[in-house]
UniProtKB/Swiss-Prot annotation:
Residues 6-71 form the J domain. Participates actively in the response to hyperosmotic and heat shock by preventing the aggregation of stress-denatured proteins and by disaggregating proteins, also in an autonomous, DnaK-independent fashion. Unfolded proteins bind initially to DnaJ; upon interaction with the DnaJ-bound protein, DnaK hydrolyzes its bound ATP, resulting in the formation of a stable complex. GrpE releases ADP from DnaK; ATP binding to DnaK triggers the release of the substrate protein, thus completing the reaction cycle. This is Chaperone protein DnaJ. GO terms for cellular component: cytoplasm. PANTHER family: CHAPERONE PROTEIN DNAJ (PTHR43096:SF48), DNAJ HOMOLOG 1, MITOCHONDRIAL-RELATED (PTHR43096). Transmembrane segments: none annotated. Homodimer. Binds 2 Zn(2+) ions per monomer. One of its GO terms (biological process) is DNA replication. It comes from Clostridioides difficile (strain 630) (Peptoclostridium difficile).
């Protein structure tokens, strides 16, 4: 019987684990026990070997099936650890594929060899800019011009960065590859890694005589006026994307994009919820009691609305298609009008008397408020 630990136990996974789960567990443990992170720790080194052995078997469907049926003994002669290639008979290439992104961080560049390539022209960066518009402009749209400070191709050197009459040279440090290779000793032998060449910034070319206008960058800053079409129905905080209006790209690479963030001012009368708007309409208690035809403000101007008699405060009525236009489609939201019945704070004697008569007609006894001493004195002087 084999004395090796169960491979599933080594990786801390169940026997029914999917391939992605196996890979995730392996990467986590390998990062933890890697010898470069545990220098001089023999136990960590052995653990690391055990983890790789387990993964080498469980990541291979054929070997995993054999292992599940016959255990460790069933793998004898199949090129497991100690077989050809050093690591599971796959050579170092498979190990590199698995750990390229991990060891790339450890060694400061690409892991392995033969994959380094010079950096290609980079797309321009995106620009983010804000505009502020009114509530009505958000509702019905607006065409506007904005000024954007962005990079433009240098007119002096046509974007090359080199002084007119000169050209870029092949980088002597990396011989035009854009990458510098290094070899480091590890417990597993020499490992080649590559990193972007610092002399040419990974481009493979250097400028010996920089352009005096752009100082070798190939671009200059300019303020550009751009026309923006604000669509009807846009809401506060939404963005408009203008493709190809961002920073200039390198060596003819595409420009970045311009993102316009729209800020919408609040309205003194209306509030917005989606494509609907809300408005509170004050009316007198007489209008509420007897009913009346009133004029209601809308985004399109005032419209007439008949308030039915007996309308209570808090009553909400709807004006169809008087809200915000929908960005996609030809329809609009609605306007909801909430009635607020205003009660007068001061009434003259005649108005009070009329209300008392009204109360009597309704069978409601309204007790007259007792006058204060000061009010009685005031009434005495009025009689004189």
């Amino acid at each position: 019987m084999s004395t090796k630990r169960d491979y599933y136990e080594v990786l801390g996974i169940s026997k029914g684990a999917e391939a992605q789960e196996i890979k995730k567990a392996y990467r986590k443990l390998a990062m933890k026990y890697h010898p470069d992170r545990n220098p001089g720790d023999k136990e960590a080194e052995e653990k690391f070997k055990e983890i790789n052995e387990a993964y080498e078997v469980l990541s291979d469907d054929t070997k995993r099936k054999t292992y599940d049926q016959f255990g460790h003994d069933g793998l004898n002669g199949q090129g497991g650890f100690g077989g050809q290639g050093g690591f599971g008979g796959q050579g170092f290439g498979g190990f590199e594929d698995m750990f390229g992104d991990i060891f790339g961080d450890m060694f400061g560049g690409s892991f392995g060899g033969g994959r380094a390539r010079r950096r290609g022209p980079q797309r321009g960066a995106d620009i983010r800019q804000s505009v502020t518009i009114s509530f009505e402009e958000a509702a019905f749209g607006k065409k506007m011009s904005i000024k954007v400070n962005r990079s433009e191709e240098c007119e002096e050197c046509n974007g090359t960065g080199a002084k007119p009459g000169t050209s870029k040279k092949t980088c002597s440090t990396c011989n035009g590859t854009g990458q510098v290779r290094t070899v480091q000793r590890t417990p597993f032998g020499n490992i080649a890694s590559s990193r972007p060449c610092s002399a040419c910034n990974g481009t493979g070319e250097v400028i010996e005589s920089p352009c005096s206008k752009c100082h070798g960058t190939g671009n200059t800053r300019k303020v550009k006026t751009i026309e923006v079409d604000i669509p009807a129905g846009i809401d506060d905080g939404q963005m408009i994307k203008l493709s190809g209006q961002g920073e200039v790209g390198e060596k003819g690479a595409p420009r970045g994009d311009l993102y316009i963030v729209v800020n919408v001012k609040s309205h003194p009368l209306f509030t917005r919820d989606g494509n609907d708007i809300y408005f509170e309409m004050p009316i007198t208690f007489v209008q509420a009691t007897l009913g009346d035809e009133i004029e209601v403000p809308t985004l399109d101007g005032k419209v007439k609305y008949s308030v039915p008699e007996g309308t209570q405060t808090g009553t909400v009525f709807r004006l169809k298609e008087k809200g915000i236009p929908r960005i996609r489609g030809n329809s609009r939201g609605d306007q909801y009008v909430k009635v607020v019945v205003e009660i007068p704070k001061k009434l003259n004697d005649k108005q009070k008397e009329l209300l008392r008569e009204f109360a009597k007609e309704c069978g409601s006894n309204v007790h007259e408020k007792k006058k204060t001493f000061g009010q009685k004195i005031e009434d005495m002087f009025k009689k004189k």
